[in-house]
């Protein structure tokens, strides 16, 4: 390219478009928290045509069968207030029915089936990055921005998903199911920040009312962390008692419902006084049994996966083996593994070092063993 040609090429704005920010419309998914509020404020100050959208997803009162217990309304109020403070339009969309069908119902049914689900991933996959993204397109937005801590980088071939600069805030585990088409349209302006302190400093700089708002800790529709109560409200009879047995089938005690237990759990089993500490190693919801065993029984080397979302440059099935790193829990670091495809949507992962407490219903996320790129992931299941 000659210097004359280069001078005629429009410079890309901060969102990657060859036009001024004022001509670039961006829908910001606003939860009412500090992260998405900062994204909206920063983009508005840069001169972008910002449209804030908040989804009404749940009502704590409905989830817990308590009148007047809705906290979602406060988040909507906070998002609307930030939009007013920064001077851009804000809309609230009622997605409660969609959220219940796509996320909450599966959450309850997964526990009934003896799995340990991750509803935040399903929400991103089936609601925020599906229906909300389509709404952004309907609003003729050039892209949609969120407050997630993850990075979108342009690689040699296409947009790539990379871990956040702040490893403590990285949300890549919860975003593995982002498709390539969605990634092309999405932007994550906070992914490069070194710490949450920087986000709060930006909120304070803009004078946002949510600058000191605490981070949410619980699943949004389980505000007090008591997921079993929510499941029993949604699926009456879900807490049927049954037997706690060892790996040989010997009855050791009784439990208060399979939904109260997860793989790897040790506390709260009510079978103390034994010489060897025992952990939940398997759940059998059909027989209403909780199977316990020694810690070594939790070690898993082979992990069956389905519903794989692949973000690699070559097709997943183009190779018999892929050397990768994987996370089988959001709180654990990536571990070296070998990915063996069965089809474009199913595979087996061999962990080079066994992991404890690998549970059906959790995600297994694929990482570049030598870098920050995310290659997608899949859902752990019991296998055929």
Curated annotation (Swiss-Prot):
Gene3D superfamilies: Adenine nucleotide alpha hydrolases-like domains, HUPs, Translation factors
Keywords, ordered alphabetically: ATP-binding, Cytoplasm, Disulfide bond, Nucleotide-binding, RNA-binding, Transferase, tRNA processing, tRNA-binding
Stretches the record annotates as Interaction with tRNA: 169-171
Covalent S-S links between cysteines: 123-220
EC number: 2.8.1.13
Keyword presence, Amino-acid biosynthesis: no
One Pfam family, short name: tRNA_Me_trans_C
Subcellular location: Cytoplasm
Residues at which ATP binds: 29-36, 55, 147
GO terms classed as biological process: tRNA wobble position uridine thiolation
KW NADP (keyword) present: no
Sites marked Interaction with tRNA: 148, 362
Active site: residue positions: 123 (nucleophile), 220 (cysteine persulfide intermediate)
Family matches, as InterPro entries: MnmA-like, MnmA-like_C, MnmA-like_central, MnmA-like_central_sf, Rossmann-like_a/b/a_fold
Catalysed reactions, semicolon-separated: S-sulfanyl-L-cysteinyl-[protein] + uridine(34) in tRNA + AH2 + ATP = 2-thiouridine(34) in tRNA + L-cysteinyl-[protein] + A + AMP + diphosphate + H(+)
GO cellular component terms attached to this protein's record: cytoplasm
Molecular functions (GO terms): ATP binding; tRNA binding; tRNA-uridine 2-sulfurtransferase activity
General function of this protein: Catalyzes the 2-thiolation of uridine at the wobble position (U34) of tRNA, leading to the formation of s(2)U34.
UniProt-recorded name of the protein: tRNA-specific 2-thiouridylase MnmA
Protein source organism: Dinoroseobacter shibae (strain DSM 16493 / NCIMB 14021 / DFL 12)
Gene transcribed to yield this protein: mnmA
């Amino acid at each position: 390219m000659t210097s004359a040609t280069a001078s005629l090429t429009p410079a890309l704005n901060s969102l990657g478009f060859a036009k001024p920010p004022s001509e670039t419309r961006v829908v910001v998914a606003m939860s009412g928290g500090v992260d998405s509020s900062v994204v909206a404020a920063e983009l508005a100050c840069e001169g972008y045509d910002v449209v804030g959208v908040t989804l009404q997803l749940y009502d704590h009162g409905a989830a817990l069968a308590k009148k007047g217990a809705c906290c979602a309304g406060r988040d909507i109020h906070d998002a609307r207030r930030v939009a007013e403070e920064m001077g851009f339009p804000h809309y609230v969309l009622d997605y409660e029915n969609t959220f219940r069908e796509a996320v909450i119902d599966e959450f309850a049914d997964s526990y009934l089936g003896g799995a340990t689900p991750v509803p935040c991933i399903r929400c991103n996959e089936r609601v925020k990055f599906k229906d909300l993204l389509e709404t952004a397109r309907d609003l003729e937005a050039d892209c949609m921005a969120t407050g997630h801590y993850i990075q979108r980088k342009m690689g040699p071939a296409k947009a790539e998903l990379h871990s956040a600069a702040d490893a403590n805030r990285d949300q890549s585990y919860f975003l593995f199911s982002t498709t390539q088409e969605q990634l092309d349209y999405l932007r994550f302006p906070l992914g490069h920040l070194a710490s949450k302190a920087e986000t709060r400093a930006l909120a304070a700089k803009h004078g946002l009312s949510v600058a000191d708002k605490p981070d949410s800790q619980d699943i949004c529709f389980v505000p007090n962390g008591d997921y079993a109560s929510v499941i029993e409200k949604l699926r009456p009879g879900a807490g049927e008692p049954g037997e706690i047995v060892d790996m040989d089938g010997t009855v050791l005690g009784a439990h208060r419902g399979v939904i109260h237990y997860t793989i790897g759990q040790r506390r709260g089993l009510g079978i103390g006084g034994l010489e060897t500490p025992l952990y939940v190693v398997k759940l059998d919801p059909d027989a209403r049994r909780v199977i316990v065993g020694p810690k070594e029984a939790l070690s898993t080397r082979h992990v069956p996966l389905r519903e794989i979302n692949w973000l690699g440059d070559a097709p997943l099935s183009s190779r018999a083996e892929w050397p990768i790193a994987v996370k089988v829990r959001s709180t654990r670091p990536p571990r070296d593994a070998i990915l063996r495809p069965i089809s474009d949507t199913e595979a087996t992962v061999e962990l080079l070092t066994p992991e404890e407490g690998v549970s059906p219903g959790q995600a297994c996320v694929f990482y570049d063993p030598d870098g920050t790129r995310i290659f997608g992931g899949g859902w752990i299941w019991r296998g055929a």
